[in-house]
Amino acid sequence: MSRICELTGKGRQVGHNVSHANNKTKRLFLPNLQNVTLLSEKLDRSFKFRVSTHGLRSVEHNGGLDNWLLKQSDTKLSARALKVKRELVKASAA
């Protein structure tokens, strides 16, 4: 299971631990991923995603999953999120 947010594309970053003596050792900074169930109001269904807490705050800030997916570019979304976005576009067109 990859450590990438399904909605924002946020993944791991590489950096250093720096000691008091300025010795540097490589380390990973992992995103805070949570398994969440988000409700789509237009589709009247819920979807499970593995989302970073940053992504979850962004979804809530934009007024829910539907608005977030319609605003977000396709390149950052996972395959499952893209599928939901296509369903939303199809439902809103009908």
Swiss-Prot record:
GO terms for biological process: translation. InterPro entries: Ribosomal_bL28 (IPR026569), Ribosomal_bL28/bL31-like_sf (IPR034704), Ribosomal_bL28_bact-type (IPR001383), Ribosomal_bL28_sf (IPR037147). Keywords: Ribonucleoprotein, Ribosomal protein. Pfam families: Ribosomal_L28 (PF00830). It comes from the Bacteria. One of its GO terms (molecular function) is structural constituent of ribosome. The keyword Lipoprotein does not apply. The keyword Transmembrane does not apply. One of its GO terms (cellular component) is cytosolic large ribosomal subunit. PANTHER family: 39S RIBOSOMAL PROTEIN L28, MITOCHONDRIAL (PTHR13528), LARGE RIBOSOMAL SUBUNIT PROTEIN BL28M (PTHR13528:SF2). This is Large ribosomal subunit protein bL28. The lineage of its organism: Bacteria, Pseudomonadati, Pseudomonadota, Alphaproteobacteria, Sphingomonadales.
